[in-house]
Amino acid sequence: MIKQALISVSDKTGIVDFAKSLSDLGVKLLSTGGTAKLLADAGLPVTEVADYTGFPEMLDGRVKTLHPKVHGGILARRDLPEHMQALEQHGIPTIDLLVVNLYPFVATIAKDDCTLADAIENIDIGGPTMLRSAAKNHRDVTVVVDPADYAVVLDEMKANGNTVGYPTNFRLATKVFAHTAQYDGAITNYLTSLTDELKHASRSTYPATLNLAFDKVQDLRYGENPHQSAAFYRDLATPAGALANYRQLQGKELSYNNIADSDAAWECVKTFDAPACVIIKHANPCGVAVGNDSADAYAKAFQTDPTSAFGGIIAFNREVDEAAAQAVAKQFVEVLIAPSFSDAAKQVFAAKQNVRLLEIALGDGHNAFDLKRVGGGLLVQSLDSRNVQPSELRVVTKRQPTAKEMDDLLFAWRVAKYVKSNAIVFCGNGMTLGVGAGQMSRVDSARIASIKAQNAGLTLAGSAVASDAFFPFRDGLDVVVAAGATCVIQPGGSMRDDEVIAAADEHGIAMVLTGVRHFRH
């Protein structure tokens, strides 16, 4: 039974109401510093920890709760007579509920003007110590680190005579250990990122010790293949607009491949300003287009490669209305992603309950790192978020691209970044016309992209081509020109750039260099 609670929080969200409810249930309240003042100002009967222990706070508040009367009351096992006798001998009442959250270390180091001294002062000592003590003794002590759990604890106390059951205590304890591990991980990441200057502004992006924190969203039926097990985890620092923030409106559970492909589709589609649609198959775009609205963009994207679009993942950067829903519903689709779905669109898919509808709020946030596991290690890099501006482009041929060609080139370049290397993308009039992906030689990607367009009945005459990396030889360029391309955008940087540029002049086409490569493996 909970008779006494110690409350000490930095995040004071909901704490007054929670403490009042505890007091109404007859629970004695202990508290520290600002939390104690807040509760007292709210008219609640609260005892300062310094008065409780008979030992004043000291060292500018660094020592408040590090006292046997606090930790003895938390750690004592109620089922061991010798523990209870020790408490009685030393006049230590039990502390049955601990409500603590920690100094805002992560928020502090996120400030541009943070100093090492600021960071150090926001490393909580007493809080984690109490949390770990209570979590260790969770059989007898209820410990709350998250304001979202206040209601859960109160409901259970009211239903069970001020008692919280073991399953809840165990869950709350595991939450504490996860929280303190993440807290210590953030401290380690920060301190080991400091260079010899020990200055906040000059710290390394890549700390000497890297701690990552993820919470499990769900177990998956299987991994990339049925013989592989899998689960999906969410980054605790998930940025706005990221796939992990999805809300599923209907459909079967997402699979491993659904989630991987959905991420590829969503990351691509949200880079466009105009209404856009992206169709993904095996993490590669098989159709991308912008249009007047979602329905128009979908019709153009689907036209690129109707065969590959079967069973694909489709993403929009605008609301899916009834017209777009009716168009998509004619095809077999695994997942449909959009910022929102109109009520009429939801009705269209109500008859197709296997279709997974995901809503994700648009946002330009990105993961802090791009991660790839290798045997016994982890490759960590910044995201490929570089968008080339028109002013950075360099025309290297005798012929300049027309304004329309430049628009097509920029569209093609944006798409090519999301195609597996080696990537060749034909585009025109705001849509992809042929996509060649994942080939070991660039010339083969060019041939495949051309064949894809032919199979879809699309002409490549006057089209624009993007290559994610330089042309090592002129053969790839010859293929795209023979297919009908009149302009090409590529990074440049090959030892044979002059030969490739000369070939472009020979063909009378325009070539633009970006100076930026977009390998994708």
UniProtKB/Swiss-Prot annotation:
Domain of life: Bacteria
InterPro entries the UniProt entry points to: AICAR_Tfase_dup_dom_sf, Cytidine_deaminase-like, MGS-like_dom, MGS-like_dom_sf, PurH-like
Reactions catalysed: (6R)-10-formyltetrahydrofolate + 5-amino-1-(5-phospho-beta-D-ribosyl)imidazole-4-carboxamide = 5-formamido-1-(5-phospho-D-ribosyl)imidazole-4-carboxamide + (6S)-5,6,7,8-tetrahydrofolate; IMP + H2O = 5-formamido-1-(5-phospho-D-ribosyl)imidazole-4-carboxamide
EC number: 2.1.2.3, 3.5.4.10
GO biological process: 'de novo' IMP biosynthetic process
Alphabetized Gene3D superfamilies for the sequence: 3.40.140.20, Methylglyoxal synthase-like domain (3.40.50.1380)
Keyword Zinc listed: no
Pathway given in the UniProt record: Purine metabolism; IMP biosynthesis via de novo pathway; 5-formamido-1-(5-phospho-D-ribosyl)imidazole-4-carboxamide from 5-amino-1-(5-phospho-D-ribosyl)imidazole-4-carboxamide (10-formyl THF route): step 1/1; Purine metabolism; IMP biosynthesis via de novo pathway; IMP from 5-formamido-1-(5-phospho-D-ribosyl)imidazole-4-carboxamide: step 1/1
SUPFAM superfamilies tied to this protein: Cytidine deaminase-like, Methylglyoxal synthase-like
CDD domains with a match to the protein in the record: IMPCH
Keywords, ordered alphabetically: Hydrolase, Multifunctional enzyme, Purine biosynthesis, Transferase
A GO molecular-function descriptor: IMP cyclohydrolase activity
Matching PROSITE patterns: MGS (PS51855)
Pfam families: AICARFT_IMPCHas, MGS
Domain MGS-like residue range list: 1-145
GO cellular component: cytosol
Keyword Hydrolase included in the entry's annotation: yes
Family: Belongs to the PurH family.
Record-linked HAMAP family: PurH
Domain comment as written in the entry: The IMP cyclohydrolase activity resides in the N-terminal region.
Protein name: Bifunctional purine biosynthesis protein PurH
Gene source species: Burkholderia cenocepacia (strain HI2424)
Name of the encoding gene: purH
